[in-house]
């Protein structure tokens, strides 16, 4: 009974009382002595493929000036130095007409959002919606004034460039990184990763 694990998904994380709810889960685990033990503790489950890996490459809720300098030095461009908005903030900005373009890299934004109707109205307020996706989903049915759906290869498909098979990595909710490669032929040679 001391090996307790509590799992939760994005719905709880993004709930208006999300911080308080998760804090109580943590308190329960602390009371039961289930933090810091193998096969016990917290397990925030992410709804989209490799979303956990976003943190590893520097996607954060704040601007890290040192990281921006390293990006500028190594990649040759100046990244933004002003904070953007998170998912809830972006939905509000679209709904209020303050965001004109919605660009979605994978995922099913509309169905993952906590308030589907509010999110749909926000997306429809945009001048342009661009979705880069491996497969069609319900979010593609709700568009701005102009809409683009751009296909990309999925992780089950071969990614070949200059005759060489490329690999990718996926980080799971436990922070484990796995190297992998696709085995299926993409639908067209023009579809890129």
Where do the PLM segments sit?
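Non-catalytic alpha/beta scaffold blocks inside enzyme catalytic domains
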Residues: 1-38, 45-193
